[in-house]
Amino acid sequence: MLDLKKLRSNTEEVKKALSNRGEDFDVNVIDEVIALDEERRKILVDVEALKKQRNEVSAEIPKRKKAGEDVTEVMAEMREIGDKIKADDAKVAELNDKINYIMLRIPNIPNPAVPEGETDEDNVEIKRWGEPTKFNFEPKAHWDLGTDLDLLDFERGGKIAGSRFTVYKGMGARLERSIINYFLDKHTFENGYTEVLPPYMVNRDSMTGTGQLPKFEEDAFKVENNGYFLIPTAEVPVTNMYRNETLEGDKLPIKHAAYSACFRAEAGSAGRDTRGLIRQHQFNKVELVKFCKPEQSYEELDKLVQDAESVLQGLGLPYRIVRICKGDLGFTAALKYDIEVWMPSYNRYVEISSCSNFEDFQARRANIKYKNSPKEKPQFVHTLNGSGVAIGRTVAAILENYQQEDGSVVIPEALKEYMRCDLLK
């Protein structure tokens, strides 16, 4: 959520920054919310004047009674003032609801470093690590390798739950688990994160706090009759651990790494990478979440990207980093980098991690603040998160990049102690 004061004082600047945001967003709603706020502020001034008048009249009543004067008219005036205050309070509450409705739907303001552009074609590549894997044979896709090696069962996943669900079997299940453990060990022992194992279901307030609601409700799996949502990412429960809290400034930055299953309806994504493990309704991920002071956040974003890179480098998987353009930025981010791993069957790089700085956008929604001393006025923290990284896509990348001509797959060196084998065959 944006700062309403900033909307009032820098209206045209904000409207310009939010133009071409790629969110089907009409910047004219900013004028609407400012008009509603002006109306609310005017009524609040009137209410304060009425309360002052009521206090003055109330103070006169005992004096008049003591003097033996009739207070009937004064009492009637008191009731009339009270009715006006009640009506104005109701109007303010109505305006608050309207303002909040709009504010929750206004996207974050892009950082000046965000490239101009409308689609992912306009994202800017800033780094490559490793070279795309070359083969002297025709490489297989990960879904064929997974089936041939009896690691993945897409057919039974579909029978159990429907399309875009997968059963991991035998060494496939062990590979998934090994990657999870490797990522968590890397981030906690080497990169300085504190591990969290969060709930997989959250309430509406939590989904609103991180920005999934109200805009993306159709992409979420909702549990009927009780208001719970299955989490689309561990970012939601981990960020909301500190909702409505004031953190100690000297404890920042706080860094958490969390493994979780993730659940996404992916409405409207039919036909886009729906074969194999790339776009599933349920998948595993290790998420990195940070809370820091505003002046720390962009340095922490750079470190976050490096931490996500470290696990891919450890696995020897070639990747590139792109800076996301304005039209592809997403609702909550101020600046975002995607890390894309090389997938031979696609002959292109495929997203495996997104790392974002939300500045105080989520903190305002979730009311997460900090202060450096007990007497200091609390300020909103900056929040960041990144995939550290998606597990299923890592499985796919390993199968495709480490495959051999005979159909076997070499285990990356970093995973051998977890897998207790050198080769999948």
Curated annotation (Swiss-Prot):
Superkingdom, taxonomy of origin: Bacteria
Catalytic activity field: tRNA(Ser) + L-serine + ATP = L-seryl-tRNA(Ser) + AMP + diphosphate + H(+); tRNA(Sec) + L-serine + ATP = L-seryl-tRNA(Sec) + AMP + diphosphate + H(+)
Binding site for ATP: 264-266, 351-354
GO molecular function: ATP binding; catalytic activity, acting on a protein; serine-tRNA ligase activity; transferase activity
InterPro entries tied to this protein: aa-tRNA-synt_IIb, aa-tRNA-synth_II, aa-tRNA-synth_II/BPL/LPL, Ser-tRNA-ligase_type_1, Ser-tRNA-synth_1_N, SerRS_1_N_sf, SerRS_core, tRNA-bd_arm
Enzyme class: ligase
BP terms from Gene Ontology: selenocysteine biosynthetic process; seryl-tRNA aminoacylation
Cross-referenced Gene3D superfamilies: Bira Bifunctional Protein, Domain 2 (3.30.930.10), Serine-tRNA synthetase, tRNA binding domain (1.10.287.40)
Compartments reported by the entry: Cytoplasm
Associated pathway: Aminoacyl-tRNA biosynthesis; selenocysteinyl-tRNA(Sec) biosynthesis; L-seryl-tRNA(Sec) from L-serine and tRNA(Sec): step 1/1
Predominant localisation class: cytoplasm
Protein function: Catalyzes the attachment of serine to tRNA(Ser). Is also able to aminoacylate tRNA(Sec) with serine, to form the misacylated tRNA L-seryl-tRNA(Sec), which will be further converted into selenocysteinyl-tRNA(Sec).
Record comment regarding domains: Consists of two distinct domains, a catalytic core and a N-terminal extension that is involved in tRNA binding.
PANTHER family named in the record: SERINE--TRNA LIGASE, SERYL-TRNA SYNTHETASE
Protein name as it appears in the record: Serine--tRNA ligase
Gene name, Swiss-Prot/TrEMBL: serS
